[in-house]
């Protein structure tokens, strides 16, 4: 997915449509910039949905492998027990016709045997125990087989969601590409310069401010130090280092340096740690934005945060605000 989106996202980097345009910019450029930004945000939201589905799919596949192994082991156990049951039946046959209880045993519902096992006068206690074990093992295998089928269904659903969200993301980027294609080369060059000037100014401020936040202790402090070292690195969707990042890739690696394992998904990361109210925020807390969640950053204090913002931008320190994407909540790890 990273390869599929990267080539299209590069258009925004070249065109520089990711920062506000000065008042002197032509009205048509302002209109195009606003529309492209809107499409970009829609694509990011859909892409985060795809990333969430990817994380879910990995977990489901891991569970599926475990359950399939259990089913295989249980199947082998039932097969081995069948040999013992066959020997019991053969022994009973030599002693005379099959009793009603054995007929029940070999019916399509082995559990019927349990209610009549005590009446098998010709079968020893050991044989009775073997027959009970066989019935229990068969029922367990049936239950596990149903679990396998259920997990397979969930895997297919996650795969479908991944494909659907990716299609939405790409369709939004296609729309944005079509808008950019209508601009002249001179207009694209002008927008690129505006973006570069703004981005360079952001980077200078971020590097100048970085020293203010290096003294935070604990896991959050370790994560901050790691992320501060990435200031200036480019944003690429799906990237998790070591020189390019997306928002959740950066926070995943930053807290990984602090010994905290997080999934590569902003929505999935929201389920980790302890919920924190906005008034109780501390440096090192994760803060989340968007409905549905499509962005995560590291809170620095003083209404500032550290994040990998968006396509065409770089890791930076920024105001604690994402405009159209509302603040959703925070987690402390």
Language model regions located:
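Hydrophobic packing segments in regular secondary structure
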Residues: 1-31, 154-229
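N-terminal or membrane-proximal amphipathic helix/coiled-coil initiation segments that transition from
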Residues: 1-69
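Short secondary-structure transition/capping segments
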Residues: 100-103, 176-204, 283-289, 308-322
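Short, intrinsically disordered/low-complexity patches at protein termini
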Residues: 136-140, 152-155, 166, 186-187, ...
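Peptidoglycan cell-wall recognition and remodeling modules
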Residues: 207-333
């Amino acid at each position: 997915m990273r390869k599929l989106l990267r080539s299209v996202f590069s258009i925004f980097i070249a065109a520089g449509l990711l920062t506000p345009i000065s008042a002197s910019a032509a009205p048509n450029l302002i209109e195009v910039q606003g529309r492209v930004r809107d499409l970009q945000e829609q694509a990011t939201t859909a892409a985060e949905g795809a990333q969430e589905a990817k994380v879910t799919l990995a977990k489901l596949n891991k569970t599926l492998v475990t359950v399939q192994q259990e089913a295989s082991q249980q199947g082998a156990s039932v097969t081995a027990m069948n040999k013992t049951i066959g020997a019991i039946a053969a022994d009973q046959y030599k002693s005379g016709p099959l009793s009603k209880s054995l007929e029940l045993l070999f019916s399509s519902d082995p559990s019927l045997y349990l209610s009549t096992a005590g009446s098998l006068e010709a079968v020893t206690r050991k044989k009775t125990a073997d027959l009970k074990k066989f019935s229990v093992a068969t029922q367990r295998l049936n239950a596990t087989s149903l679990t396998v089928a259920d997990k397979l269904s969930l895997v297919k659903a996650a795969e479908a969601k991944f494909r659907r969200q990716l299609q939405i993301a790409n369709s939004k980027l296609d729309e944005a590409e079509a808008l950019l294609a209508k601009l002249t080369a001179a207009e694209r060059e002008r927008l690129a310069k505006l973006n570069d000037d703004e981005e360079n100014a952001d980077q200078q401020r971020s590097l100048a401010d970085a020293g203010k936040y290096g003294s935070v202790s604990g896991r959050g402090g370790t994560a901050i130090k790691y992320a501060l070292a990435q200031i200036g690195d480019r944003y690429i969707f799906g990237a998790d280092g070591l020189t390019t990042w997306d928002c959740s890739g950066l926070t995943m690696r930053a807290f990984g340096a602090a010994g905290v394992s997080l999934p590569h998904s902003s929505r999935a990361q929201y389920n980790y740690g302890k919920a924190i109210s906005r008034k109780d925020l501390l440096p090192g807390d994760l803060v989340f934005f968007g409905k549905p969640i499509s962005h995560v950053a590291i809170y620095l204090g003083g209404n500032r945060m550290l994040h990998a913002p968006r396509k065409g931008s770089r890791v930076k320190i920024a105001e604690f605000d994402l405009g159209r994407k509302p603040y959703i909540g925070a987690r402390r790890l």
